Amino acid sequence: LTILRRELLYTSLTEDDQIIEEFTFTPESNIPFVEPRAWHRVTPLTDDLECYLEFYCEPKNYFSNKYELNPAHSEVVEAVKTIKPCKVLDLGCGQGRNALFLSSLGFDVTAVDQNIPGLQYLKNVAKAENLDIKVAHYDINTAAIQNTYDFISSTVVLMFLNPECIDNIITNIQEQTNIGGYNLIVSAMSTEDAPCPLPFPFTLKENELKEYYRDWELVKYNEDFGHLHKTDANGNRIKLRFATMLAKKVQ
């Protein structure tokens, strides 16, 4: 809350509209930060009051709120609690929800995808936000990553790729990860107890991703149920089993 002219009455309230405390603020006042979900009321004390409100959000939600992107993937948000800013490849970046989030935290981001309109959108947002993100067109099926990285992230991507290329793709990802670096993969599964309800070109089997990374340190691994942003005929987000893995290259 910033006051440019005159004064206002700020009232802090309970959820049932009971007054907790009141303050009169002017342009000279040291106005405290209004906490999220804090009930309050603002009352002008003059007819010519000039003021404005600025709304803040967490970094993980900033780009989704401002540019109507999906939020940064929850596993990427979780991973940065372990991984400090470093050289990262967002493999299959889409419109850049994860690349933008990582870049805003100080990561040196390269973002690649085959979707040219999505890449252009990412370039536009990065320019508007003054973020230095290297954006490139790349067919993941070629398994031809050239540079090495400290962190390679590929969330909700493998299931859209050519099944015959998966072995080479994962090998290439692993080879281009520096020792001590990390891979984050989240991808759809199809298992006996939970057949995949969508016709993805590729789905992981039980323990398949874990086996690919048997020589790595598994920081996190599960095969839990999750939801796609895509909805079914009733408007419910589609539920299926995902392999979720954060692994560290130790040799």
Question: Could you describe each region identified by the protein language model?
Answer:
Residues 1-9:
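Short, conserved beta-strand element in jelly-roll/cupin
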Residues 16-36:
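Short acidic-glycine-tyrosine-enriched beta hairpin
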Residues 36-57:
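Ligand-binding loop in jelly-roll beta-barrel domains
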Residues 58-83, 89, 95-133, 137-144, ...:
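Class I (Rossmann-like) S-adenosyl-L-methionine-dependent methyltransferase catalytic domain
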Residues 86, 150:
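Conserved acidic residues
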Residues 153:
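A conserved beta-strand element that flanks and buttresses the S-adenosyl-L-methionine
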Residues 156-157:
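Short catalytic micro-motifs in class I SAM-dependent methyltransferases
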Residues 167-179:
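A short glycine-rich, Lys/Arg-flanked "PGG" loop and its adjoining helix->strand segment in the class I
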